Every structure is written in C-alpha cells, then in structure tokens.
Amino acid sequence: MRLSLPSIKKNILLLAAASTLFLSPSLALGAPASPDSASVASIRDKALQSDSFAYDIVEGLTTEIGPRQGGTEAEARARTWSVSKLKALGFDNVRIEEYQMPTWVRGEETASIVAPFPQKLAIAALGNSGSTGDAGLEAEIVYFPTIDDLRAAPDGSLKGKIAFVSHNMKATQDGSSYGAFGPARFVGPNIAAKKGAAAIVIRSIGTDYHRNPHTGNTNFDPGVTPIPAGALSIPDAENLERMIARGKPVRLKLKLTPKNVGMQTSGNVLAEVKGSNPELPMIVIACHLDSWDLGTGAIDDAAGCGIIGAAAKHLQSMGQPKRTVRLLWAGAEEVGIWGGRDYGEKHATEPHAFAMESDFGAGKVWGVDFRLPESASALRGQIVSALAPLGVVPRKELAGGGADVGAIIAAQKLGIIDLQQDGTKYFDLHHTPDDTIDKIDKAELRQNVAAWVATLALVANYDGELKPEAAR
C-alpha cells in the first residue's frame, strides 16, 4: 500500500519515538528526569536580574539584629527574627531546634608598648581567651615569625613572657591562605600556653591594612589553662615587628578581661520546601545565623543565609520539587560549630542525600566542585551548562561541603556541590568591625542566588543516586 507523505512522516516519528524508548535508558527505565534547560535558564536569569529576597534578608538581619554571637541574647533574637522571616517567605515546617553550649563573652581590651617605644596597639581578644584580670599584665615579648617557629620553641622557654606570632597571609581567590595561616590563631595560644607563656598576641588572620583587629575562635586542650590571647591589627603587628628588629627588648602591657558565663541556649532554625516524593532522601542547604560581635555579620554569614533563602524561594516558584529541600540556618558556628554538630546528631538517621553550604561572603561564584557518583554524570553536565552563562567553570577539586553540614555529611556520606565564590577581598573584612552591609555588592549577591537556584532546580528534581559510590 502506498503511503501519503503525511503518513510517512507520522510513521517515521513513531519509529523514532519507539527507538528512543529502546535506546535511551532514561526514558525506557523511568530514570531521573530534570526540568528542561529553558526552565532552569529562565529562573536563573530572573534571579540574576531582579532577585530582592537575598538582600532583604541581609538588610533585615544586620539592621534589626546586628551582631549575634552564639549563646547570647542577640542570637536568640536572631532566631525569632528568622522564624518570622522564613514563615513570611512561605516555607514549610519552620522551627527552632535548641541546644545548650558553653558561652564566652568579651570584656575590656587594651594593649600598649611600655618600652622602648611607648604607644597603643589595636587588639581584640580571641574567642576562649583567658583573662589578664582587671590589673592586666606586663611582660617582655618573644617574637616568632611563624607558627612553626613557636612549635619549635623549647618547653618552658616562654615562662613569664608574652609570645608574639606573625605570618605572611596573602589574598587568594579561593581562600586557601586561611587554611595555611589560620593555625596561628587556631592552635597558637594552646601551644604557647603549653610552653609556659603568660599570654600571646598574634598578627590578625587577615589581608587588609586597616587598623581593625580580626577576632576568631581558638581552643585549648583539656587540662591546659587558657592564657590571654589577642589579635593585633595588621598595621600594629607590622609596627611591632619593626620595633623588635631594632634589637631592644620590647615590653607589652596587656589587658583582656573576657569571661565564661556558663551553659547558655543556642539553636538552629530549620525550614523546608516540601518535595513531591517522600521516598527520595532530602537535600540540606546551610548557612550560619550567628556572627562575631565586632561587626554586624553581613558577609559572615547573613549573606549566606540570604543566598540560600532566596534560592529556595525561587525554587518554590517552579512548582513542587521531587526532593524536599531543608534550609539549615545554623547557630553558634563561629564559636565551635555547635549548630552543625547538633544537627548532625539529631538528624543522623533521617535520610539525606546531598548537602550544600554558603559561608564565604557574597563575592561572585566563579567555580563549581562536585562530589557525586559516576551515575550522576549527566546531572553534572546539566549543572555545568546551566552555570556557564554566569561565568562559572567546573574545577577538578572534589567538593567538601562546609562546617555546618560537615557532621551530617560525615554521618551519611552525602553528595556535595560547592559553588566557589571569589574570596579575594573576604579576609579584608573577616571577623572585623568592617563586616557591614555596605560591603555587599547587590549584583554579585544576585549572581550567587542565580547560581544556587540553577543548581538546586536540577538537583532537587533528580531522582537518581546522589551519594558517591564509596558511601553506599
């Protein structure tokens, strides 16, 4: 029988469709389906051009709450504020999960050179610093150009002295210098205490040349009595080095009077975008709600909460995703990752598949790292394609997540994507009084939201395996 041209075309289309079912496992076996690329591009571009949710969160949190150190009354007000905001944005299951934590608070802070060149220095106590007492203390400085030089000092050699540890931290796009030079703060005071030092001052872990010291947490081993520990502003640290280079003994008068106020309440704020398929393990996306007490915590980490909150809000506008997306606005990250650890303990057996975190300011996203199974290579490719118009390129490094999702990742070996932000200027502001909203670039903040929602739209609607093979 002779077929008409329309019939031939129809049969060709039917054959093509049939062959696709046989040849394409994704269609034939009902494997993961994702939103079409046009839908993802549309929501990405909408966020890039007109998102206001992220900045609104940053502005509200920094204006109406301000500094919000973990375990304090200000952090409690931040939790109340966050619940109200997340409910107003239409999220599901908004709630607070409280926990108790030991709490340290700042006191008086002064430092001055007594001899040979008397002058004041700008200083901030490090979290968990011991106290000099109200009278303060005066002692000779022993200079260590690096943390390794301090490590090499003989035991007992610092008795009655004030250790001064310097370093040469430089700005990097990926923030890698923080890991290299941060130990001066992370462990320097503990090492100095073990070697008998009466106190320690360090060059701030930062890259700016403002006379603003950078605070941050330090920790002492069990059984080690905390000694007074402070960070000098970088200009003051360099001035102190010049004094030492003149070859005369340098004496420092130091007064730091922080105190421990015992166990206090902190907590995490949780919210959700409910998924359509309860059989699929959820996604958790995180920021931290607390901040240090010197600035208003705009870049660290109100920006992160704004980014993930806005991305989840835009995701809602696409319709219900397959997977539930849980927002974790973690408490008390700065002073010991208490919120992230509490979440990991309380939700260790609740099925999760994947985690992301935003805690590196509001600089533009420039790179993307993955930790996904080989079976998710198509998803990886879709994400790379969706991010390319934003100037985001795939990197070879494996994604690692962040502090607030670290415990749940460890408990369940989750899949991870890291959206790498430009941190070139981040450590100019980190943990200083300069961490304020005027440092947020609105266009760069929107670019973050665009990258996040494009990624979330694809991951939250992917019903294949997200955990790396080694985790299963």
Region locations from a protein language model:
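Soluble metallo-hydrolase cores and metallopeptidase-like ectodomains found primarily
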Residues: A38-S39, A115-D155, T218-A298, A310-K313, ...
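Metal-dependent peptidase/peptidase-like ectodomains
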Residues: P118-K120, A139, I227-A229, A237-E238, ...
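Extracellular/luminal Protease-associated
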Residues: T72, A122-P228, T296, P394
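His/Asp/Glu-rich mid-to-C-terminal helical/loop segments that flank catalytic regions of hydrolases
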Residues: K313, S317, F427-R472
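N-terminal capping segment at the start of a domain
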Residues: S34-T72, N212-N217, D290, S358-G363, ...
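Second-shell loop/turn segments in exported
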Residues: V40-L48, T63-A74, A139-F144, A153, ...
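Catalytic-core environment of secreted peptidases
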Residues: S50-E75, V83-L89, N93, D155-S157, ...
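Noncatalytic luminal/extracellular "stalk/propeptide" segments of secretory-pathway proteins
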Residues: P32-D36, V40, L48-S50, E59, ...
